[in-house]
C-alpha cells in the first residue's frame, strides 16, 4: 500500500468544450489550457468514459469483466492501458478498482485498488503471488463488495486482493473508465485505432442493488487529457450541456420573475436538479426554457435521499412507457408530470379517473401519462398517513420550473381552482398547490398573492368540513 497522486479527468458539462473538439484535429490544434491550470506531468491521457448516477447508497456489489488483448497492435513501447470502475460521492471522494496493462512488460498486468479521500490518495497493487505484481490472464472478472466503508476484492473467483478500509458510505455515482497513458506528444481525439482502444476491453460492469444506466460524458479538451473517440463526444446531446450566461445584477426597476429566471445555464438531469437546489437548472426539449431553483433550506422540501429514490422510480416509469434516459424523453416526462400535478393535485377523489392524464412523447411515440401512475411512482406504494405530504413536498423542487412553464404558456393552469378562489389573472403562474416562492426572486404583490392563495386553500378545506366554503381569494384582503 502506498500513496499515489490523483490526476483529474476533468469532467465537463459545457457546450463550448464539445464544440472545441471539432477543431481539435491534431496535437498542435489543442485548445489552450485554462487559466491557472497546471499539468500534473508530461504524459498524455486519453479516455473512454461513461457515468451512471443512483440514489445515495452505503453498500454496493460491483462486478467488472475485462478482456485482455496483450498482442494488440498500435501501442508504443512505453504505453499503459487500464480499465476500471470508480465509485464516487458528491464531494469527489472515490474508490477505484481495475486492471492496468504495461506495454514494456508483456506479461505484467496489475490489479489495482485506490481510494482518494479528502485530497489524499492511497493505492494497493499487490500481485497474485505478492512479490512480482504480475498477472497474465486472457480475461479478468473482478468482484468487489463495498460494505460499511470496507471494500473486499476477489479476482477470477480465486485471488483475494488486500481489503481497503475507511471508505465513504454515501456513494452516488459510478464511472466506467478505459484510459491510455502515453509519452507520445502527438496524440489527439480520434487518432486511436480500435485495436489500441481494445487492449483492455470492458465487457460488462454490473452494480447491485441499485439500477444503473450508463451515458457517455464529456471531458474538457486539454492538450494532454481528452476523450479518446470523437464519436463519443458527438453522441452527447447539446441540450444536456451548459451554456454560459451573463451575470445580471439584481434589478430595482420592476423586472419580473420571468426575466430573472431566464438568465441561467441549462441542464436536463432530474437528479442534478434535486441534488443542487440553488444551482439546479433544467432545459426542456425545445431548448427555450431556463430555470434556476432557489438556494434555500426548507424542511417543507422532501429530504434529498427520498427525492432521489423517487427520481429512480420516475425513470423506471419512463422506461415502462417505451421511453429512454435521453434528455428529450426525461424533459418531456418532467413537463408532463408538472402539468398533471398543476391540474389534479388537489382533486377530492384521488382514485383513478380516466380523464386525469396528459399526452406526451416518449421514445418518439405519443403516449398517455396518467396522474395515478405518476403519483404511485412518487409514493412508491406507500399510501398511509405521514407527517408531510410526500407528493407536495417532492413537487416543491419543481416550483420555479412550474412558474416559468406557466409564464411561457407551455402548460395550462388549473383554471377551475383559480376561478373558484378568485385569483386575479396576472397571478395565475404563482398560485398552484406546490408553489413555494423565494422573496429574492419575486415582487411583494406576487408573494402576497401566493400567501393568500395558500391561506384561502387551508381555510376552504376547514370550512368544507363544516358545510360552508369560501369562493374568492379577495374576500380576505
UniProtKB/Swiss-Prot annotation:
The record's InterPro entries line, in alphabetical order, gives: Closter_coat
Chief location category = virion
Does the entry feature the keyword Ion transport, yes or no? no
The record's family statement is: Belongs to the closteroviridae minor capsid protein family.
- Primary role: Minor capsid protein that encapsidates the 5'-terminal portion of the viral genome.
Q: Which GO terms describe its cellular component?
A: viral capsid
Q: Tell me which domain of life the UniProt entry assigns to the organism this sequence originates from.
A: Viruses
Q: What is this protein called?
A: Minor capsid protein
Tell where it localizes. Virion
| Assigned keywords, A-Z | Capsid protein, Virion
One Pfam family in the UniProt entry: Closter_coat
This chain's source organism reads Grapevine leafroll-associated virus 3 (isolate United States/NY1)
Amino acid at each position: 500500500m502506498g500513496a499515489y497522486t490523483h490526476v483529474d479527468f476533468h469532467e465537463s458539462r459545457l457546450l463550448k468544450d464539445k464544440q472545441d473538439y471539432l477543431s481539435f484535429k491534431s496535437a498542435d490544434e489543442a485548445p489552450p489550457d485554462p487559466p491557472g491550470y497546471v499539468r500534473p506531468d508530461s504524459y498524455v491521457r486519453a479516455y473512454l468514459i461513461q457515468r451512471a448516477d443512483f440514489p445515495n447508497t452505503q453498500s454496493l456489489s460491483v462486478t467488472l469483466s475485462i478482456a485482455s488483448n496483450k498482442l494488440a497492435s498500435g501501442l508504443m513501447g512505453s504505453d499503459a492501458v487500464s480499465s476500471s470502475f470508480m465509485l464516487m460521492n458528491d464531494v469527489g471522494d472515490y474508490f477505484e478498482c481495475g486492471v492496468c496493462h504495461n506495454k514494456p512488460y508483456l506479461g505484467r498486468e496489475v490489479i489495482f485498488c485506490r481510494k482518494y479521500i479528502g485530497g489524499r490518495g492511497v493505492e494497493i497493487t499487490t500481485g497474485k503471488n505478492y512479490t512480482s505484481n504480475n498477472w497474465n490472464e486472457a480475461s479478468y472478472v473482478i468482484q468487489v463488495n463495498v460494505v460499511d466503508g470496507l471494500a473486499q476484492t476477489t479476482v477470477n473467483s480465486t485471488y483475494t486482493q488486500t481489503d481497503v478500509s475507511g471508505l465513504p458510505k454515501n456513494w452516488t455515482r459510478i464511472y466506467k473508465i478505459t484510459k491510455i497513458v502515453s509519452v507520445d506528444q502527438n496524440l489527439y481525439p480520434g487518432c486511436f485505432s480500435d485495436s489500441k482502444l481494445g487492449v483492455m476491453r470492458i465487457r460488462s460492469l454490473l452494480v447491485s442493488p441499485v439500477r444503473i444506466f450508463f451515458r457517455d460524458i464529456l471531458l474538457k479538451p486539454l492538450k494532454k487529457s481528452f476523450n479518446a473517440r470523437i464519436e463519443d463526444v458527438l453522441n452527447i446531446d447539446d441540450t444536456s450541456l451548459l451554456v454560459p450566461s451573463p451575470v445580471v445584477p439584481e434589478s430595482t426597476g420592476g423586472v419580473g420573475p420571468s426575466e430573472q429566471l431566464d438568465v441561467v445555464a441549462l441542464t436536463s438531469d432530474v437528479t442534478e436538479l434535486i441534488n443542487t437546489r440553488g444551482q439546479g437548472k433544467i432545459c426542456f426539449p425545445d431548448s427555450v426554457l431556463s430555470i434556476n431553483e432557489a438556494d434555500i433550506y426548507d424542511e417543507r422540501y422532501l429530504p434529498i435521499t427520498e427525492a432521489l429514490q423517487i427520481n429512480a422510480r420516475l425513470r423506471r416509469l419512463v422506461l415502462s412507457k417505451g421511453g429512454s434516459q435521453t434528455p428529450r424523453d426525461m424533459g418531456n416526462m418532467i413537463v408532463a408530470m408538472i402539468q398533471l400535478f398543476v391540474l389534479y393535485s388537489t382533486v377530492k377523489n384521488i382514485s383513478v379517473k380516466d380523464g386525469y392524464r396528459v399526452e406526451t412523447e416518449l421514445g418518439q411515440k405519443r403516449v398517455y401519462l396518467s396522474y395515478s401512475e405518476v403519483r404511485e411512482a412518487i409514493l412508491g406504494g406507500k399510501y398511509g398517513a405521514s407527517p408531510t405530504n410526500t407528493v407536495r413536498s417532492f413537487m416543491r423542487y419543481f416550483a420555479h420550473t412550474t412558474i416559468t412553464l406557466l409564464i411561457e404558456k407551455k402548460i395550462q393552469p388549473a383554471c377551475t381552482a383559480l376561478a373558484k378562489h378568485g385569483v386575479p389573472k396576472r397571478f395565475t403562474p404563482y398560485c398552484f398547490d406546490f408553489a413555494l416562492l423565494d422573496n429574492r426572486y419575486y415582487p411583494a404583490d406576487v408573494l402576497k398573492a401566493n400567501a393568500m392563495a395558500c391561506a384561502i386553500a387551508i381555510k376552504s378545506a376547514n370550512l368544507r368540513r363544516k358545510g360552508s366554503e369560501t369562493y374568492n381569494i379577495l374576500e380576505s384582503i
